[in-house]
Design a protein with these regions (language model features):
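Conserved "HGTGT" condensation-loop signature of ketosynthase/thiolase-family condensing enzymes
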Residues: 1-121
Length: 121
């Protein structure tokens, strides 16, 4: 069995405590949790009224034609992947090869996306 090597060259993240690695690191060092009261949850009748909301305007950061086919979780993953490319100092053209991969994680779809999907049903 041939061993294959993997190299982590860059990281990117968007979260309720920051929209890039520097902001997230600073928030962690300062003990900022990012959890706050969410009035929208109250309006929707949720029992829990708190959330770790991400404060970023996706429509300002992603081309409209691309964004219209993305859910919020996919959009956050996309922006995080672009940050990872910048962190690695790699050009976006690197995606033209089949020797690159992105490992992405998400806490799940947004509550708003779930409510919208239920309304469609």
């Amino acid at each position: 069995m041939t061993k294959k090597r993997a190299v982590i060259t860059g990281m990117g993240s968007i979260s309720c405590i920051g929209n890039d690695l520097k902001e997230i690191s600073n928030s962690l060092r300062q003990g900022i949790s990012g959890i706050s009261k969410n009035d929208e949850y109250d309006d929707l009748g949720f029992r829990s009224k708190v959330s770790g909301s991400i404060l970023i305007d996706l429509k300002d950061l992603i081309d409209r034609k691309l964004f219209r086919f993305m859910g919020e979780a996919a959009a956050y993953s996309y922006l995080s992947a672009l940050d990872a490319l910048r962190d690695a100092k790699l050009p976006e053209s690197i995606f033209e090869t089949d020797r690159i991969g992105v490992i992405a994680g998400s806490g799940g779809a947004s509550s708003r996306s779930q409510v919208d999907a239920a309304d469609i049903l």
